[in-house]
A protein has these predicted regions:
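Gly/Ala-rich beta-loop-alpha elbow adjacent to hydrolase catalytic centers
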Residues: 132, 136, 140
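Conserved acidic catalytic loop of the alpha/beta-hydrolase fold
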Residues: 111-128
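Alpha/beta-hydrolase fold catalytic core
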Residues: 1-63, 85-87, 125-126, 309-328
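Short beta-strand/loop motif that positions the catalytic acidic residue
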Residues: 250, 256-258, 262
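Conserved alpha/beta-hydrolase catalytic His-Asp/Glu region
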Residues: 189-249
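Flexible "cap/lid" loop of the alpha/beta hydrolase fold
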Residues: 145, 152-186
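Catalytic active-site module of serine/aspartate enzymes centered on a nucleophile-bearing elbow/loop
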Residues: 280-328
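Conserved HGGG/HGGXW glycine-rich cap/lid loop of the alpha/beta-hydrolase fold
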Residues: 48, 53-99
Length: 328
């Protein structure tokens, strides 16, 4: 059984030239112009320190961003400044990742959902729009199931939770051990991989559709801050939890965003989420991999902002309507 069940295959390096003008650009406002130390905070959740970014203000509901496995808050660098122009935004390092301490108890998807809820409660955020990528989407959906009064809008970006439930556990665990060893490369080795186009393509082709088009600074930040301490226990937690039969319990407006060429989580999982969550809508970004918010940030930002800004109780066909190069 394949570890990566997607039918997508890596793009050739020269295909990057045809990726479109919105691929691999810096979004506006540019995150490089921000002193992020001014927005870094920490909170105590279950006796452990959790790091997060808190910025922006506005009349709209706050937006909370949840990263994927081996990720960190920097996964949202291309998105936070734009969202912060209109509302308060919070992006956390999940327990065991980035600048957050390891969790106090065994890692589980429901437990991570409770950690997200605890942070929202501590920050007195009220109802939020919750945005999660990959494992973060798994956690975001679980949070919406556990705490429906907290999540007013839900955005699942290449979310885990469907195909992973049917994978061979032993094979995936073996892959996880190999991934941890591969991820333990030194800062110098990582820098070499990022700066050399051919090597960058080889190392990051599973994550990004066109790695050589992603800005070097963005990859540096994501790679340098990625915490891998909790990788294996979190991977096992994902394998141990199946919430597919509970997805119909999600009642908030939900937008599903995917990359058509996602090599990590197959695009057909988006169809399953759409079928399972009442009233869910789906947007698929063409020629895009596992992290649409990094690969096509400007298109992603406007698509999601339009969705979460929709008046309460109103559902419009045009909200979440894809731009050129995006299908629904």
């Amino acid at each position: 059984m394949a570890i990566l069940p997607s039918k997508a295959r890596p793009a050739t390096p020269w295909a990057a030239r045809r990726a479109g003008e919105d691929y691999g650009v810096h979004a506006d406002p540019d995150w490089r112009d921000i002193d992020w130390s001014e927005h870094l905070r920490s909170a105590e959740i279950d006796g452990r320190r959790v790091q997060y970014v808190d910025m922006g203000s506005g009349d709209g509901r706050p937006v909370v961003f949840v990263h994927g496995i081996a990720g960190n808050w920097q996964n949202w660098l291309e998105n936070l400044p734009r969202f912060a122009q209109e509302r308060r935004v919070v992006a956390l390092d999940l327990p065991g990742f980035g600048g957050s301490e390891d969790p106090a108890a065994d890692v589980s998807i429901p437990g991570l959902g409770r950690a997200v809820e605890a942070l929202c409660d501590q920050l007195e955020l009220g109802e939020v729009a919750l945005v999660g990528n990959s494992m973060g989407g798994f956690i975001a959906a679980e949070t919406a199931i556990q705490f429906p009064e907290r999540v007013e809008r839900l955005v699942l970006v290449s979310a885990a939770g469907i195909t992973i439930a049917s994978l061979n556990r032993n094979v995936v665990k073996a892959w996880g051990r190999a991934a941890v060893m591969a991820g333990a490369r030194s800062a110098a080795e990582t820098r070499m991989a990022i700066l050399r186009p051919r090597l960058r393509h080889m190392v990051f082709a599973t994550l990004f559709r066109h790695p050589t088009r992603i800005p070097t600074e963005t990859i540096f930040e994501i790679a340098a801050g990625a915490g891998r301490r909790a990788f294996r226990p979190t991977l096992e937690a994902m394998l141990d939890y199946d919430f597919r039969d509970r997805l119909p319990e999600i009642r908030c407006p939900t937008l599903i965003v995917w990359g058509a060429e996602d090599m990590i989580i197959p695009a057909h999982d988006a169809d399953e989420f759409e079928r399972s969550i009442p009233g869910a809508r789906k947007v698929v970004f063409d020629d895009t991999g596992h992290v649409p918010m990094v690969e096509r940030p400007m298109t992603f930002n406007e698509c999601v902002l339009e969705f979460i800004s929709e008046p309460r109780g109103q559902q419009t066909e045009d909200v979440g309507k894809p731009a050129a190069g995006v299908s629904s």
